[in-house]
Structure formats: structure tokens, C-alpha cells
A protein has these predicted regions:
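Residues that define the transmembrane beta-barrel architecture of outer-membrane proteins
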Residues: 279, 308-312, 337-341, 380-384, ...
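Membrane-embedded beta-strand positions of outer-membrane beta-barrel proteins
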Residues: 295-297, 316, 328-332, 356-360, ...
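C-terminal transmembrane beta-barrel domains of outer membrane proteins
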Residues: 470-633
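Periplasmic polypeptide-binding modules associated with outer-membrane biogenesis and secretion
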Residues: 4, 40-44, 55, 64, ...
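Transmembrane beta-strand segments that form the barrel wall of outer-membrane beta-barrel proteins
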Residues: 270, 293-303, 314-318, 324-336, ...
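Transmembrane beta-strand segments of outer-membrane beta-barrel domains in Gram-negative
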Residues: 355-511
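Extracellular loop and loop/strand-boundary signature of outer-membrane beta-barrel proteins
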Residues: 301-302, 329-330, 370-375, 417-430, ...
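Repeated loop/turn-to-beta-strand initiation elements of outer-membrane beta-barrel proteins
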Residues: 293-295, 322-328, 351-356, 365-366, ...
Length: 633
């Protein structure tokens, strides 16, 4: 449901060149992520009148392509004012270190384009009414004072009384008795219980009471065929939770729809047939697996100029590593001044799509932007994360999930090829920062054929654990923050989309650079350099419309014009000064090219409406952003 395509910002520390040189001279010695007998009629098999055989190859359209930078950046901001700073050219703004590794807990997944769900009427068609079985002595009548319906776990006696009352206290032909039985069966059918129904067992009329027995249908077994690497139990277990007795058509339909939306499956066919015992059925499912191996090649200018804006990235993901539906992903990112690697493993825990995931990332960077390159500023960072996510509500159109993430992040920066520790905000005397935190998150998604709404909330508690940085005064690893993110994608016309995004962070105290909120860059306020503003709290909003201007049906290609407006504001807590300016506003225009699901290319031009000091040596700093995403397979 993109989740929020806005880049989740890291943090940083800043200082001016004069201070850096003075420290370099005076501190050269410093240390561097849960009883039947013969009856009036035989106990029937309540099944659809025709076998159900559905074959689907419907696939959801590709996700909105949002380049979420998992890379690693930190920023330098003024901290000291010394006379030697006069040697810096006046048009050069405080420059940036690479942002620290950005773990998955700060990167919500992109939402998909609104798309129709697999049609229900092609899955399990509603059966016709049960036929009345011919029998002898149709002119015989009886008088019934009361009917007793037994064997039902679905309907109450009061609900059955509404159906049986017109057949009591009067002479009743035997044929009417069977009409009543059929009416009770129809009640089940109308509520989706297509393999349940009623029959009249053998009995002697006593005290004017006739017993009608209900057989509530259930599955005898689920057979799965067509799997290659994927375990059949992956499919079977997800259908089993929706097919508990009594078997309900609507619940089975929803389970089949959810299964068809699973990226591990390309197509699905299902057939319901009679089992070996009365009231039992066999569900046969034929699946075709989708390719579980995917790769992405990304080239853009989404990194900070201090380490080189041009980013090269390769991502490889295996969605079914061991046959359990477990996903293993790896990515490598490179710029002229940085290298980063990110690994993740996601293991399904239960048929309700609960998952346990582990993520690791590591990055090393060097400042290559003049005039700061002479200081030989280097940084290293890594994160570890362990996360549990469990959908609480899951339907083809809505999902509500809760999760908990334990994260550990650490960074280290030095000057002069590692000779002097970098005096980062909140760092220890060795220039190191360590953070341990628990994140409790909530995610909600609503989708229809015309819109997708995605919401994400996350509460983070910083901990004094795992050698975390603890200082006499903040910032350190002890903090509390809340982050809320939202996205609404609306289909206005064919291939015409409205995309609204929002992002808000509120903290209770000054934050370590690792947890600060950033504004500026390709996935934030376009028109400014990456992370032009960094602060403890922040708000970001964006509106974008995508208009088709060229369609290439033979090539499955689409070119869209994308006008947009971005704005954001950031502010600090405690004694730290607010950024100046604290608000960024920009408008702009872009082109977006989509070629099948193999290529997505984008070019944006952001026009800043708020002036900000700084050099304009790169395309990014002049408001131009490009992105090319290639998916070979």
C-alpha cells in the first residue's frame, strides 16, 4: 500500500572548517540495529451443483517505484566559531558527512498502485438450491406443533423459528416437510455455507415434534499440487485457517484472493469436490509458482554531495530461500566516497503471515567535497535489527499489523586518516556513538481498485543497554520519540495518479544524529541538497500528480508528467538553535518513464522557494534529480 516514499532521515553532526583545523593541530595525540438409520431421505452431500475449477493468472501491477535510500549519511553543522574559519569561502555552506546506515525500521515499504482484486465470481460460484427428492405417500399429512433443528453451530433457535413457524399448528403435507428442509438448507447457502444443509432423519412423530438434522460441512483434506521449491504446506496452512468447520464460501474466497496476491504465486486454481464421508469435502488447489529471484540495478544522484551524489546500487533478493517462503536480500551501494552493504532475512512464522526478520548494514565513507576533503574525514557505521511483525486483521482490501523491533546502531568518525576522533554531537571522546532502542510500530493499509491508503506509526524508546552512549546531558541513547507516516494514492483517470505523502517526528529531548529528522533531497523536499536540514523534530508533506503524456502499448511503456510541491519544517529541542531557515518549500516538474516492469526512469526539477546558503556544484544542489531502476529479472 508506496508506503511512504519519503526517505527516512538519519542524523549528523556539524562543524566548521576552522574548528576542524584547530582540533587537528592541537589534538594530534588524541585517541582515535499463533443415531443414523434408514431415513426418509439419505444424509446428503451438500456441495456445489458443479465442480468449481478456477484458474487465475491475475497479477497486481508493479509497485510505485520509490527510491528509498538505505545509504548512510551524517551532516556537519556549525558547532564552533574560530577565526581560522575565515579561510572558508563565504558561499560554502556547512558540508555533509554520509548519513549513518538507515535500518529497515525507518523505511516503510512503498504502497502499490490501486488495482482490482481477483474477481470473486470466478472462484467459487454459488450453488443452486437443493432439489426436492421425490418420495411416495405425498398425499399423507401430519400436524406438527413444533420443529426441532439440531446440529447447528451457526444459527440460533430463534432464527430457525422464523422459518419453521409457518409450517406448524396445521395439517402439513409430507411434501411441505421437505420444502421446510430445503428452506433451512437455503438459509445456510445464503450465508455462504455451501457444503452445509438439512435433512429429515427417520423418526416417529411424538407430541407433535419433528426433528430436522443439520449437517455442517467441513473439509476432509486440502491437496496442493504444482509447487516446485515452495513447500505445499505454505499454501495448505494459509487455506486451513479460513476453512474451519463449518466451511464458509466467503471466507474461502478471501483466503484464495489473499493467496493470489502472494508474490510467490503466479496463478492459482481451486476445485471443491465431495469427500469420502457425508458432509465432508476435498479442496484441490493447483498453483503455479512465480519467480522468487529478483534483482534491481539503481543509478541516481540521491546521496549527499560530500561523498558524491551519484549512487550505484545492486539489490538481489531470493523470496523463497529454503522453500518456507523465507526471503534473503542483499544490496551493495557505492558512490565516489562511500561503500555500503545491507543484508536482511525474513522468516514466516505462522500462516497468518507473521514474520521474524534480521537485518544488518555496514558503511564506510570519506569526505571528497572541496574544501573539506583536505581534512581526510572518514566515518564508519553499522546497524543490527531484529523485528517481529504480525498482521492482526488481513483481508484482500485491508491489513492491520503490529510489530516490535530491537535495534542497535553505532557510528564512528575521525579526522586526518583516523588520527583524531571527530567531535560529533553526543559522541564519546573516541568519536563513537552507540544507540540501543526498542520500536513498537503499527501499520494499516486500505486498498480498492481506485485508491490505496497507508498509515504507519512508530514509538521508539532509547535504552541504556549494549554499551549505548550515555552522557551527563542529552543527546544520548536515552530518549522517546514518535514518528507518523501516511500516504494516499488515488487513481483519477487511467494512468493518472494523485500521490499525497506526509511524515512527522516528535521527540521528548535533543536527539543523537542517528535519530534526527532530515529535510531535503530526492525523497524529501526536492530542490535542495540531501539532508539540507537536520533537527530533533520535523514535518514533511508532499503532493504530486502523474499525468500520462505518451503511451506505447506495443512496448508496454508509459511516459508521465509529474508536477509536485514539497514542503517541510524542522526544529530542535533544548539549547540547540533551530536550523536557519527552518522551513523549506519547493515546487517542480518531472518526467517518469515506465517500461513494463523492467525499467523505471525519472527526472525531476525542483525549484526552491526558500533561499538557503550553500554551494551549487552538483545537479542535486541545482534542483535536478535523476533515477534509473532496472530489473533484469
Amino acid at each position: 500500500m508506496s508506503w511512504l516514499t519519503g526517505s527516512v532521515q538519519g542524523a549528523s553532526t556539524t562543524f566548521q572548517l576552522g574548528c576542524s583545523v584547530l582540533i587537528a593541530v592541537s589534538l594530534v595525540t588524541a585517541k582515535p540495529v499463533k443415531g443414523q438409520g434408514v431415513a426418509l431421505e439419505r444424509a446428503p452431500q451438500f456441495l456445489p451443483t458443479t465442480a468449481t475449477n478456477v484458474k487465475q493468472s491475475h497479477r497486481l501491477p508493479t509497485l510505485l517505484q520509490a527510491t528509498i535510500d538505505p545509504a548512510h549519511q551524517s551532516t556537519l553543522a556549525p558547532a564552533h566559531q574560530l577565526t581560522i574559519a575565515q579561510s572558508i569561502p563565504p558561499n560554502v555552506a556547512p558540508q555533509q558527512l554520509p548519513r549513518e546506515p538507515s535500518p529497515p525500521s525507518t523505511q516503510p515499504p512503498p504502497a502499490s498502485i490501486p488495482a482490482p482484486l481477483p474477481p470473486l465470481d470466478q472462484l467459487l460460484p454459488l450453488p443452486g438450491s437443493q432439489p426436492i427428492v421425490p418420495f411416495e405417500n405425498t398425499l399423507e399429512t401430519i400436524t406438527v406443533d413444533r420443529f426441532e433443528v439440531v446440529g447447528s453451530t451457526v444459527f440460533s433457535a430463534a432464527e430457525f423459528a422464523k422459518i419453521t413457524e409457518p409450517f406448524t399448528k396445521r395439517p402439513l403435507a409430507i411434501v411441505e416437510l421437505f420444502q421446510l428442509r430445503s428452506a433451512i438448507t437455503q438459509l445456510y447457502l445464503d450465508k455462504g455455507y455451501i457444503t452445509s444443509g438439512a435433512y429429515v432423519p427417520p423418526q416417529t412423530l411424538q407430541r407433535g415434534v419433528v426433528t430436522i438434522r443439520v449437517i455442517e460441512g467441513k473439509l476432509e483434506t486440502i491437496t496442493v499440487t504444482g509447487t516446485r521449491r515452495l513447500s505445499p504446506n505454505y499454501v495448505r496452512s494459509r487455506l486451513a485457517i479460513a476453512t474451519r468447520a463449518p466451511l464458509n464460501r466467503d471466507q474461502l474466497l478471501k483466503a484464495l484472493q489473499l493467496l493470489q496476491l502472494d508474490p510467490l504465486l503466479q496463478s492459482l486454481s481451486a476445485e471443491l469436490s465431495a469427500g469420502t464421508r457425508p458432509g465432508e469435502s476435498v479442496l484441490s488447489v493447483q498453483v503455479t509458482e512465480a519467480s522468487s529471484l529478483s534483482t534491481q540495478l539503481i543509478f541516481d544522484n540521491a546521496r549527499a554531495p560530500s561523498v558524491g551524489t551519484n549512487r550505484r546500487q545492486i539489490q538481489i533478493s531470493q523470496g523463497n530461500t529454503t522453500g518456507l517462503g523465507d526471503r534473503l536480500s542483499a544490496s551493495y551501494t557505492n558512490t565516489s566516497g562511500s561503500n555500503a552493504i545491507d543484508l536482511s532475512y525474513v522468516l514466516p512464522l505462522n500462516p497468518r503471515n507473521g514474520t521474524l526478520s534480521f537485518s544488518y548494514g555496514s558503511a564506510s565513507s570519506s569526505i571528497i567535497e572541496p574544501p573539506f576533503d583536505v581534512l581526510k574525514i572518514e566515518s564508519k557505521a553499522r546497524y543490527y535489527e531484529l523485528a517481529f511483525r504480525q498482521p492482526i486483521v488481513q483481508t484482500p482490501t485491508h491489513e492491520l499489523a503490529l510489530g516490535l523491533t530491537a535495534t542497535h546502531r553505532q557510528s564512528e568518525a575521525t579526522l586526518l586518516d583516523g588520527l583524531i576522533p571527530f567531535p560529533a554531537l553526543g559522541a564519546d571522546p573516541d568519536g563513537k556513538t552507540r544507540l540501543a532502542a526498542l520500536r513498537f510500530f503499527q501499520e494499516a493499509t486500505w486498498r480498492s481498485s481506485r485508491e490505496v491508503i497507508a498509515l504507519r506509526s512508530q514509538f521508539t524508546v532509547g535504552l541504556n543497554a549494549l554499551s549505548a552512549t550515555i552522557n551527563p546531558d542529552p543527546p544520548d541513547s536515552r530518549f522517546f520519540s514518535w514518528r507518523g507516516q501516511a500516504q494516499w494514492v488515488r487513481l483519477l483517470a487511467p494512468d493518472t495518479l494523485l500521490l499525497l505523502r506526509g511524515d512527522l517526528q516528535l521527540a521528548d529531548r535533543p536527539m543523537l544524529p542517528l535519530e534526527q529528522f532530515g529535510l531535503g533531497g530526492q525523497d524529501s523536499v526536492r530542490g535542495y541538497r540531501q539532508d539540507a536540514l537536520l533537527a530533533d523534530n520535523g514535518l514533511f508533506a508532499s503532493a504530486e500528480v502523474r499525468f500520462p503524456i505518451l503511451r506505447l502499448p506495443k512496448l508496454d511503456g508509459l511516459l508521465q508528467l509529474t508536477p509536485f510541491i514539497d514542503l517541510g519544517t524542522a526544529w530542535n529541542l533544548g539549547n540547540a538553535l533551530d536550523p536557519d531557515p527552518r522551513t523549506l518549500v519547493a515546487v517542480g516538474l518531472g518526467l517518469r518513464l515506465q517500461y513494463s516492469d523492467r525499467l523505471t526512469a525519472r527526472l525531476d526539477w525542483g525549484i526552491p522557494l526558500t533561499d538557503i546558503n550553500g554551494a551549487k556544484n552538483t545537479l542535486q544542489e541545482n534542483g535536478l534529480y535523476f533515477s534509473i531502476v532496472i530489473r533484469p529479472f
